[in-house]
Structure formats: C-alpha cells, structure tokens
A protein has these predicted regions:
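N-terminal subdomain of nucleotide-sugar transferases
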Residues: 1-39, 151-156
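Short N-terminal targeting/anchoring amphipathic segment
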Residues: 45-64, 77-79
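Membrane-proximal helix-turn-helix segments that form the acceptor-binding/catalytic region
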Residues: 100-116
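The feature captures the alpha-helical scaffold/lid subdomain characteristic of nucleotidyltransferase
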Residues: 107, 166-252
Length: 252
C-alpha cells in the first residue's frame, strides 16, 4: 500500500506533528509512506508516487481542500482527519466569521467529497455527525494521548481503515488486467464443454498473472454482481492459483 500524508507543517513540540511522526514511522513497517507539507510539491509527488491513499491532516486551509480535490480527480482514495478542528468550540470561538466563510467556500464540500473521515474519539465523531456533512467516519485512537495504545497498534488500525476505504471503492482501482479477466472468467465458468482450449493463450496468461490484490478486487466485483459462483467455477476448471478470500467478512 502506498500512502501520502499531507500536513501544513511539521513543528517541534507540536502535538499534531508528534502524532503524525509517530504514525508514519510505525506505518513504514507495513506500507510505503510519504509525507508532504505546504512547502512541498504535492502534485509532483502525487504523479510520481501514485498513492493508493491520500490522508489529509489539515483543516480550514484552501490548499488542503485543493489537494484533496486534485487527488480525487486522479482516482486516489482520499481520507481526512480534522483533529478536532470541526468540533463546535473550534468552529464558533476561534475565527468564527472567517470559518463561516471558509465553510461555505470549501470546507463543507471537502468533507462531503472525501471517501471517509478518521477521528480519534467517539465524541469527535458525534460532533461531526451533527454537522450533517458526512456519515462516513471511523475512529482510531491517538497513541500520543492514549498511553495504553502503542504506535504500532495505531498504525495497524489506521491501515485497516485505509483497507476498508479501498475495498469500498475497489472499482476505481481495477486495472486493465482485471477488467479483461472478467469476461474470460465468465466465459469459462459458463461454458458447457469440457475441452482444455476454452481460452486463447493470451487470456489464459492474463488470468495466471493476476496477483492477490487483483483477485481480491475481482472477488468483490463478483460478489456485487452476483457472479461469484461462476468465477469460482472457472478458477476450479482452470486450476488457477487464486487466493482464498472470504469477501463476506470484508468490511466496506
């Protein structure tokens, strides 16, 4: 998994900066992780790195909203952590008039457009739900504030959240190989004849070249389209090396 984290700046002794540094350091054990700040070239990193997930950690900034929109246009999954900046106190006591304008111009739109929000407590989740902008909100506690939670556990829970988001929008991630594989799987799965030459060699090679992530997306698609039994029949007939994945247990 390839992840880009965006934050306005990294500051020594800053609570949010400490959180992000601990999160990204732990995540690097399980994923390819990059961090970019306001001073970095976000668009270039997005094009060069081609992330699966863009995680925005900055609220009330037009540049952050622009980056979220740009990443979405590039078919990246975008998640947003407001870090308590959307609770009532932050909205109504700090730069109240300015934030009202920003809400109308871009902040509410950003929240509605991202794939999901990630917050650190149920109270923060409830505060955001009251706004009515989105219901797609998950919780992973902050190891900086919760000493009983290790950085590693926080990283793993966050990556599980990313996986949930990716599984929800799997069709955006489907490659040409997967899209070409679907008709082949259906052809063999539905075929009445039992000959060994049910597919041309190039189509058979395509099926045998699929990796576990590609099979995962194919299985999710097959479940959603009601063709899983046909796909499984093809896998059995051709003795394809497909992973065993219980898609019914996948949270989306």
């Amino acid at each position: 998994m390839r992840i880009i984290h965006y934050i306005d700046s990294i500051k020594a002794g800053n609570l949010l900066s400490d959180y992000l540094l601990r999160l990204t350091t732990a995540q690097k054990e399980y994923a390819d992780v990059k961090t970019v700040t306001q001073q970095g070239d976000f668009k270039k990193l997005l094009a060069d790195f081609q992330p699966d997930i863009v995680h925005i950690h900055t609220c009330w900034e037009y540049q952050a909203a622009t980056h979220a929109n740009w990443a979405a246009k590039k078919q990246c999954a975008v998640v947003f952590s407001p870090h308590w900046e959307l609770d009532e106190r932050a909205r109504t006591t700090e730069q109240k008039s300015t934030k009202k304008v920003k809400t109308l111009l871009y902040q509410a739109k950003m929240v509605r457009r991202v794939d999901a929000l990630l917050v650190s407590s149920e109270q923060e989740r409830q505060d955001i739900l009251k706004l009515g902008w989105t219901k797609r909100i998950d919780i992973v506690q902050d190891s900086v504030l919760n000493s009983s939670l290790s950085d590693d556990d926080m990283a793993l829970q966050t990556i599980s959240f990313y996986r949930k988001v990716l599984d929800t929008r799997y069709q955006f991630a489907m490659t040409a190989m997967e899209k070409e594989a679907i008709p082949s799987l259906l052809h063999v799965g539905l075929a009445q004849e039992t000959t060994h030459n049910l597919l041309p060699s190039d189509q058979l090679l395509n099926l045998r070249s699929l990796n576990p992530e590609q099979w995962r997306r194919i299985f999710l698609y097959a479940d959603d389209e009601g063709i899983r039994e046909i796909v499984d029949n093809c896998i059995s007939r051709l003795q394809l090396n497909a992973p065993t994945i219980d898609t019914a247990a996948i949270q989306r």
